[in-house]
Amino acid sequence: MSETGPSLQRPATRAARLSAIEQALATHIITSQSQLSKILIDEGIAVTQATLSRDLDEMHAVKTRLKDGTVAYTVGRSVVASEGEDVGERGEAQMSRVLNGLVTSVAAAGNLVVVHTPSGAAQYVASVIDKQPIEGVLGTIAGDDTVMVICTNDDTAVFRSDWLLSLASK
C-alpha cells in the first residue's frame, strides 16, 4: 500500500492478526520473528513471541533462501516483494495464467475496477488478486460473475484496469 493511501484498520481478533501477518510476509522480507513483531506493533497489533510462533506454524510459514541469499519467512508459494516493490514477475505470471482464461472484460469506474468473469469464477479471480501485494489496491468484492477491485483513487483504478487487462491478454 502506498503511504498516501488510507491505513487499514483491523479489529483485535485472531483472524485480523493472521491477516496482518500474511500481509506483512507478502510485502516485506521478514528474517526474524522479532522483525515481524515490530511490524505488527506498528500496525497496532501486540503479540507474544509464543503466539507469533504458533501463528507462523499454523500458516505453514517457512524460512526460505531468496535469490539474494537472504533467508526469510514465506508462506506456501507466496511471492515476496521487496520494500516498495509491486507484484514481481513471478506473481504477474501466476496472475496472468488465471486471468487469461477467466476475465471476459475489465473497466474502470471511479476508484473501482469492474472485472467480469464467466459465471462462478469471480470469487476465485478476486482471491488471486487479493493474495498479491498490489500497490494502490485496497481489496476486492466478488459476486458470481463480477469482481470489484477497490483502488485508492480514480487514477489508480484506470492504471490497474489497464494492467489487469494486459495480464488477462497474455
From Swiss-Prot:
Record keywords: Amino-acid biosynthesis, Arginine biosynthesis, Cytoplasm, DNA-binding, Repressor, Transcription, Transcription regulation
One record GO biological process: L-arginine biosynthetic process
One MF term in the entry's GO annotations: DNA-binding transcription factor activity
Pathway: Amino-acid biosynthesis; L-arginine biosynthesis [regulation]
Annotated localization: Cytoplasm
Pfam families: Arg_repressor, Arg_repressor_C
Keyword Cell membrane in annotation: no
Classification via SUPFAM superfamilies: C-terminal domain of arginine repressor, Winged helix' DNA-binding domain
Transcription regulation recorded as keyword: yes
InterPro entries with a match to the protein in the record: Arg_repress, Arg_repress_C, Arg_repress_C_sf, Arg_repress_DNA-bd, WH-like_DNA-bd_sf, WH_DNA-bd_sf
Listed GO CC annotations: cytoplasm
Classification via PANTHER family: ARGININE REPRESSOR (PTHR34471:SF1)
HAMAP family registered for this protein in UniProt: Arg_repressor (MF_00173)
Stated family: Belongs to the ArgR family.
Function summary: Regulates arginine biosynthesis genes.
Identification of the protein by name: Arginine repressor
Organism: Bifidobacterium longum (strain NCC 2705)
